Each structure stands twice: as C-alpha cells, then as structure tokens.
Design a protein with these regions (language model features):
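A conserved catalytic-core segment of Leloir-type glycosyltransferases
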Residues: 38-101
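Surface-exposed, flexible loop/turn segments at secondary-structure boundaries
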Residues: 12, 44-46, 76, 117, ...
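Short coil-to-beta-strand
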Residues: 2, 63-70, 130-134
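Short amphipathic alpha-helical segments
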Residues: 18-19, 50-51, 82, 121-124
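A general structural motif
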Residues: 1, 33, 105-106, 130
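Mobile beta-alpha loop/short-helix "lid" or hinge segments that flank ligand
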Residues: 66, 138-141
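N-terminal subdomain of nucleotide-sugar transferases
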Residues: 1-64
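An aromatic- and histidine-rich active-site surface loop
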Residues: 14, 84-98, 106-129, 135-138
Length: 141
C-alpha cells in the first residue's frame, strides 16, 4: 500500500466546522489502495478548541480509516501575532511530531498552501524521506 502525507495546518476531522477537503481526498485515495495521513494543527481554527491534553505534543487519531496527526500549536484569535506564532509552531513542530510517532515513511508528501509555512514543512519532510513533493496551491494570497 502506498502512503501519502498531507500537510494542512487547518484540516478538520469529519463533523467539525471548517474544511474537510483533505479528509474527503484521503477517503477517496484509500479506496484506491493508498494509506493517507493528514498532518494538522492541534487547534481548531474556527473555534479555538485545543485537541491535545496538557503535556501532549502530538496525537494520532483515525476517522473512518483516515489517520490524523495533530501537532501542538497554541491558541489564537484573529489575524494578529498569535496566529503567526501558531503558523511558525506548526512549521517547526511537524518534523519533530513525525519523528515521535510510529508513522511509516511516506511515498509522497503533499503540502497545502493554506499558509506558505505549511507547504514549506511538507517540502522539508519530502526532502528528508527522499520522496516526491506536491505543492498544492490553494490561495495566492
């Protein structure tokens, strides 16, 4: 089975407010023999809900066979400094979180440009694992 890692800071599990596009893509890929992991921030963008308990730096959960790796970021509201800090935390915590889990190495990494640092984190992982990188441009800002 081929493995794909999808990096999207704001990805959502099913049933939550916000974008579930990568979850839908992962379910579709699963029907075609791919194992997908979505790597997202621990803080839910729309509500500010923290998915991790105190002391946790990452957590793996599955929804309908789609794996999510939640990476610790801090809460924020609005578009100020705290949100930028969350973006930086995501970009720098993703490689550490991946190393701390038992995820099998990917065959391809997709970095979504929900903000440039998310895609940059994906490019770093692809380089580390020597696999192709797909830069998903979603918003040209």
């Amino acid at each position: 089975m081929k493995r794909v890692w999808m990096l999207n800071h704001y990805a959502q599990e099913p049933g939550r407010p916000g974008g579930t596009r990568h979850y839908s893509l992962a379910r579709h890929l699963r029907q075609h023999g791919w194992d997908a992991t979505i790597i997202a921030a621990s803080v839910e963008h729309k509500t500010g809900r923290q998915r991790l308990d105190a002391g946790e730096t990452q957590k793996v959960e599955s929804y309908d066979g789609v794996r999510f790796l939640w990476v610790r970021t801090s809460t924020y509201s609005g578009n100020g400094f705290d949100r930028i800090r969350s973006m930086l935390q995501y970009a720098f915590n993703v490689p550490r979180a991946v190393r701390s889990t038992e995820l099998e190495a990917p065959d391809v990494v997709i970095g979504s440009s929900v903000h440039p640092l998310a895609a940059w984190a994906g490019a770093r992982l692809a380089r580390r694992y020597n696999v192709p990188f797909i830069f998903e441009i979603r918003d040209l800002w």
